[in-house]
């Protein structure tokens, strides 16, 4: 096993986030304070430029857009998480106003039935998952987001969003693009699991049986090579969803497990930063989850992965402070890169003990 004893996150129950609302002790690795060599002066400069760029891209309605994805709750939520990764909240910090405006945009797109999706959303459960994650983090960092009215709106939207996730789980244990319990894929499922983890951290009740079923589904999607297939039917592994699969098992409180060891090993073989053969498809999505998986694995896994992805992202920053993802756009790529690069700061509750 490649685990050290320093804890980095409060993880949920084995095969469940909320059994009796108790949190087990997690024998994890990275400390809640960044190690001396994790954050460099060069990284600080890169992050500062990226935060400035991202702030400037916010639209008048509080949203961020990307490529063909206008008025998008997923990109907006990720952008706000990136700003919060610097330690700011909706009520304090240099980027507080931008976070508040983004939060208001997300809340304005929260329907009575709990679904968070802008009008143009296609396959809204991805956006719903990221939006619920953002609401959970905002609620956890500020006990509601600042003023009383916003606090009440945030709490109500978060609870309704969690209940929608719970009632749209399908019989296999997963979720897919639309909020109906019909079919499932591992990618959308993992997005919901992380959202539920954040909500649970913020004190929102999450049904144990929902997470039990989700973990079982994710386990059944793992291939013999350690990677994860897209759906339960036979399929090949791909590293971005495999990174997400490993991270989700950690977030479900599974620390020492053959499935995790196999998944971490697969990522080292197939997707290590700087590996020429690693596919660039879904690059930022994949590394968003991969760095979390390695962060949770700790020890030599984190020690090898972190400086490599840090330097790779630094080298890829454009002159204006952004990163580019052709299908989705620079706001998305920059938000994802910032979340990755600021992870050692441990400001977001999901990355704290």
Features from the language model and the residues they span:
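An alpha-helical repeat/solenoid feature that recognizes helix-turn-helix modules
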Residues: 21-49, 63-98, 111-212, 220-308, ...
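Patatin-like phospholipase
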Residues: 103-106
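Large, well-folded core regions of big proteins
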Residues: 55-58
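Bacterial N-terminal signal peptides that target proteins for export
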Residues: 1-7
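Bacterial N-terminal signal peptides
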Residues: 7-16
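Predominantly the C-terminal beta-signal and adjacent terminal strand-loop region
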Residues: 314-318
